Swiss-Prot record:
Family under the similarity heading: Belongs to the GrpE family.
GO cellular component: cytoplasm
Name the record gives this protein: Protein GrpE
Source organism phylogeny: Bacteria, Bacillati, Bacillota, Bacilli, Bacillales
Predominant location: cytoplasm
Its job: Participates actively in the response to hyperosmotic and heat shock by preventing the aggregation of stress-denatured proteins, in association with DnaK and GrpE. It is the nucleotide exchange factor for DnaK and may function as a thermosensor. Unfolded proteins bind initially to DnaJ; upon interaction with the DnaJ-bound protein, DnaK hydrolyzes its bound ATP, resulting in the formation of a stable complex. GrpE releases ADP from DnaK; ATP binding to DnaK triggers the release of the substrate protein, thus completing the reaction cycle.
Alphabetical list of Gene3D superfamilies matching this protein: 3.90.20.20, Head domain of nucleotide exchange factor GrpE
């Protein structure tokens, strides 16, 4: 009987051991599932954070590019402003320059008038030199081909000695500042 008792005890021990093993395995499975869930949650969180980081990096790069564009535009505006800074002054002085030209076109036999005209011519030439220093030039007209970018045709001519579309007379001088026309030349054009 003791042998039977021993067998029963051994059997009970084995069953108990198996139950413990099953419990351990089920606990490990639960722990693995919990760990897998935790990993999945952590991975999802990592993915979410990586996406947010990518989004923030993209925004940063766009803002940096926008800043560079604004900076370049500011430099271009400043350069254009510097390049054409004397345009408004030239526009204001052109009527006075026209008056000088009309006055200098007169002739007189009186010595006093000749002296005054000589002084006016000196002032006129000084203004032209100042214009030249600022990049303001007279637009060539007589003998040139008509160019609507620089000339304004106000009259037509029928001169056989001149080529077609050639400027035969200048009624008012035109001026340009570097590459920008301040005032087009008013001209008479051959047909």
């Amino acid at each position: 009987m003791s042998e039977k008792k021993n067998k029963k005890e051994r059997l009970a021990d084995e069953i108990e051991q198996e139950e413990l093993n099953i419990l351990d395995e089920s606990e490990e499975t639960v722990e693995e599932e919990a760990t897998a869930d935790a990993l999945t949650e952590e991975q999802a969180k990592i993915l979410e954070l990586e996406n947010k980081l990518d989004e923030v990096e993209n925004r940063y790069l766009r803002m940096q590019a926008d800043f560079e564009n604004v900076k370049k535009r500011h430099i271009a505006d400043r350069d254009a402003s510097q390049k054409y800074r004397s345009q408004s002054l030239a526009e204001d002085l052109l009527p006075a320059l026209d008056s000088f030209e009309k006055a200098l076109a007169t002739t007189s036999d009186q010595e006093e008038v000749k002296q005054i005209l000589k002084g006016m011519e000196m002032v006129y030439n000084q203004i032209l030199v100042a214009f030249e220093k600022e990049g303001i030039e007279v637009i060539p007209a007589v003998g040139e081909q008509f160019d609507p970018n620089f000339h304004q045709a106000v009259m037509q001519d029928s001169d056989e000695n001149a080529a077609s579309n050639e400027i035969t007379a200048e009624l008012q001088k035109g001026y340009k500042l570097k590459d920008r026309v301040i005032r087009p030349s008013m001209v008479k054009v051959n047909q």
